[in-house]
A protein has these predicted regions:
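Active-site-proximal cap/lid insertion segments
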Residues: 36-40, 47-63, 70, 79, ...
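Residue-level detector of anion-binding/catalytic polar loops
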Residues: 77, 153, 418
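N-terminal secretory signal peptides and thylakoid transit peptides that target proteins
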Residues: 2-19
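His/Cys-centered metal/cofactor-coordination and adjacent catalytic loops
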Residues: 104-143, 201
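Short, surface-exposed beta-strand/loop micro-motifs that present aromatic residues
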Residues: 144, 225, 408-420
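C-terminal segment of N-terminal export signals and the immediately downstream linker at the start
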Residues: 25-44
Length: 475
């Protein structure tokens, strides 16, 4: 049965309404405050390559995630939440800027080394350009710097991934405390990326904890930071490396997990099952670490005045469970872009709710700015909006479109229409009836396809013209 075709007028009205609604919502400033006026603390937790169904609360039946399930029960779970890129670096850049990768300049990975360790990357991975080997444009204003207006102290514990030269490190971008690694991946125990040390404390490389599991280290440092700053507003950003595969020389690369967690699952009967168990164990170890962070907030009596945000940086890879979505990390299908997400904010967001509204990670930056009572940087265009009213069930999402580009791969969602044109497949899909993107409607709906392509061309031009300052060159 074919899907009715919207008229051109209706289609353009949708796009126009989207722009107006986004513009209006960016100016909304409604944030509940604790008695005494102290702005809320902020805890942002990001997992790495976690599958859409790698959580009990998202329908997963195999992985134990009691603490994340509890977080969802205490807040709202987002079922229709997207990131801006199907892999690491640009997704993280958008979180910290509230802007499309194409607008903030971080539209590809920062490798920081030639990946020639016997692993056959595609030819484009070897291209050496300043944009790929340096870091995020230093003219971009990141979330922690904006929050300083309200007296926040900010720390990051885990994966940075926005440049390893000193001028790109977290302390130069507004953070006050950093313990973690700077590249896209790491060995969970040696803290090396393909044999090269990658861990930093603040501005200096360190091997002080070599041999200790990274999830435990990032938990430890985040706990320390929250303890030390319990009497002032803080942003604690914890981007775990779990359950990303380890960046080691051996092949196939494993997902490393403590033996006790591996043994807590049924013994695998094959190599494939063993790899899946490693993945599950790494997720459960991370879940336990998150449980410790949430427990400390309760112990310090900060939980009622702390916003907690959790999501995965992109779709799952390896043995992750992305069902019922098509595709995986690196792809423009839903399995690469739609991710698990939950938000807890007592007093602002009802507990135990589910939000099916169309939202993205670019909404987090303006939401947190509004919650803190600070204005975004003057003259900076945000591509997101404060989603608090949406999460509270008080308003529908003003977002009507989202567009993606990863090198030659392109995709766009307008309302419930999703267009994909990529090396892994292409098509036009109606997500209202086909979340698995199994039925290509491009031949049945050629007018819709052409209109979305035309909108994508307009967006591409908008992004090219958005920054009159010119491309970033820091060399």
């Amino acid at each position: 049965m074919s899907t009715p075709t919207p008229s051109r007028r209706d289609f353009l009205r949708t796009l126009g309404a989207s722009a107006v609604a986004l513009s209006a919502s960016r100016g909304a400033m409604a944030s509940p405050r604790r008695p005494g006026g102290r702005p809320p603390n902020i805890l942002v937790i990001v997992s790495d390559d976690q599958g859409y169904r790698d959580l009990g609360c998202c329908g997963g039946q195999t992985i134990r995630t009691p603490h994340l399930d509890g977080l969802a029960g205490d807040g709202v779970r987002l079922t229709n939440f997207y990131v801006t890129w199907p892999a690491c670096t640009p997704s993280r850049g958008s979180l910290l800027t509230g802007r499309y990768p194409q607008r903030n300049g971080t539209y590809d990975m920062y490798r920081n080394e030639k990946p020639d360790y016997g692993y056959k990357y595609p030819p484009e991975e070897y291209a050496v350009t300043p944009e790929r080997i340096l870091g995020m444009d230093t003219r971009e204003v990141l979330l922690p710097r904006v929050l300083k207006q309200a007296g926040y102290r900010s720390g990051i514990f885990g994966k940075w991934d926005l440049g390893q030269l000193r001028r790109f490190l977290p302390l130069q971008r507004g953070f006050d405390d950093f313990y973690g690694y700077v590249n896209t991946g790491i060995d969970y125990y040696t803290h090396e990326r393909y044999g090269v040390p990658s861990m930093y404390r603040n501005n200096e490389p360190t091997t002080e904890d070599k041999g200790t599991y990274t999830t435990d280290l990032f938990q430890r440092e985040a706990l320390r930071f929250m303890q030390e700053n319990r009497d002032r507003p803080f942003l604690c950003y914890v981007p775990f490396n779990a359950p990303h595969i380890a960046s080691v020389l051996e092949r196939p690369r494993p997902v490393q997990a403590p033996e006790a967690y591996i043994e807590s699952y049924p013994k695998p009967k094959s190599k494939d099952e063993a790899r899946r168990v490693e993945h599950m164990a790494a997720v459960t170890a991370m879940d336990d670490a998150i449980g410790e962070l949430l427990a400390l907030l309760e112990e310090l009596e900060l939980a009622d005045n702390t916003i907690v945000v959790f999501f995965s940086d992109n779709g799952g890879s390896g043995t992750a469970d992305n069902a019922p979505l098509r595709g995986r990390k690196g792809q423009m299908f839903e399995g690469g872009l739609r991710v698990p997400c939950m938000v807890r904010w007592p007093g602002a967001i009802p507990a135990g709710t589910v939000c099916d509204e169309f939202l993205t990670s670019m909404e987090i930056f303006p939401m947190l700015c509004n919650a803190a009572g600070v204005a975004p940087p003057d003259g900076v265009v945000l591509d997101g909006f404060d989603m608090t009213p949406v999460l509270a069930g008080k308003a529908p999402s003003p977002r009507k479109e989202m567009l993606w580009q990863r090198r030659g791969d392109r995709a766009a969602r307008v309302e419930n229409w999703k267009w994909v044109e990529s090396a892994k497949g292409s098509g036009l899909f109606d997500l209202s009836t086909d979340i698995g993107e199994a039925h290509d409607l491009s031949k049945e709906q050629p007018e819709v396809l052409e209109r979305i392509k035309a909108r994508f061309a307009e967006w591409t031009q908008e992004m090219a013209e958005a920054e009159p300052r010119g491309p970033f060159r820091d060399y």
